[in-house]
Regions:
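Nucleotide-sugar donor-binding/catalytic module of glycosyltransferases
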Residues: 1-118
Length: 118
């Protein structure tokens, strides 16, 4: 697997739902999704479960709130792919986003880092 999409989240189930929906509509589904919940009061796993059939999801719920920076590091540590794409739980992707990113990676084989700002 080439890409891990890493999503730190905290108490934003509606935003995460929309983000996961946009990921499930990708034209290329060969990627993993890593989600680290920073001890939300909401049942975030309930939001994730319906997407497990279509997406390769890894989920972590912190036992206590670690703060944004440590939750960011936690979700990164879950990734097993060559490249990590950090998404906010409120980010939405066009359906061809993963496919386009893979094309960029394949064209620029000597790059170790891509900055995407949309």
């Amino acid at each position: 697997m080439l890409i891990s999409v890493c999503i730190p989240t905290y108490n934003r189930p509606k935003s995460l739902l929309n983000c996961l929906n946009s990921l499930s509509l990708q034209t290329d589904l060969d990627f993993e999704v890593c989600i680290s919940d920073n001890c939300s009061h909401e049942n975030i796993e309930r939001i994730i479960d319906p997407y497990r059939k279509k997406l390769n999801i890894k989920f972590n719920k912190n036992k206590e709130n670690l703060g944004a920076a440590l939750n960011f590091l936690k979700v990164a540590s879950m990734a097993k792919s060559e490249f990590i794409w950090f998404l906010g739980d409120d980010d939405l992707l066009f359906p061809n986003a993963i496919k386009e990113l893979k094309s960029l990676i394949n064209i620029n084989k000597d790059c170790d880092f891509f900055w995407i700002n949309s």
